[in-house]
């Protein structure tokens, strides 16, 4: 599938469904707050990207509802789990446990806890 830029009405299904295709949806907005509201108006939240100034990047990371976020990332950079460097997991309907693969907390969900008490005679 060739990459595509698509401008479609906000009610179009491409706005609400994960396609895993090289499609970038376009919609004109009045300001960044409107853009963020539209970005977060989704039942999904795997990845999100942003291009902006140094002063805008912290705002983006605090506001976006996605598990893997990028700011000012150049084309061709990887998206994926790098153990010890980049956990990979989605929020909302894009995740199931809230714990990302390769995160500090991921392995613990597969471990069994056991409390042991020994009273010496």
Map each language-model feature to its residues.
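Conserved C-terminal structural/oligomerization subdomain of aldehyde/semialdehyde dehydrogenase
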Residues: 1-121
């Amino acid at each position: 599938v060739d990459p595509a830029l698509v401008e479609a009405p906000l009610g179009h299904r491409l706005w609400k469904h994960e396609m895993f295709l090289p499609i970038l949806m376009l919609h004109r907005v009045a300001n960044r707050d409107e853009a963020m509201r539209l970005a977060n108006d989704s039942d999904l939240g795997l990845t999100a990207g942003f291009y902006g100034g140094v002063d805008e990047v912290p705002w983006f990371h605090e506001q976006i509802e996605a598990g893997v976020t990028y700011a000012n990332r150049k084309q061709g950079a990887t998206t994926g789990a790098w153990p010890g460097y980049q956990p990979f997991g989605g929020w909302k309907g894009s995740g199931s446990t809230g714990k990302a693969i390769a995160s500090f907390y991921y392995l613990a969900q597969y471990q069994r806890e056991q409390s042991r008490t020994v009273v010496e005679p």
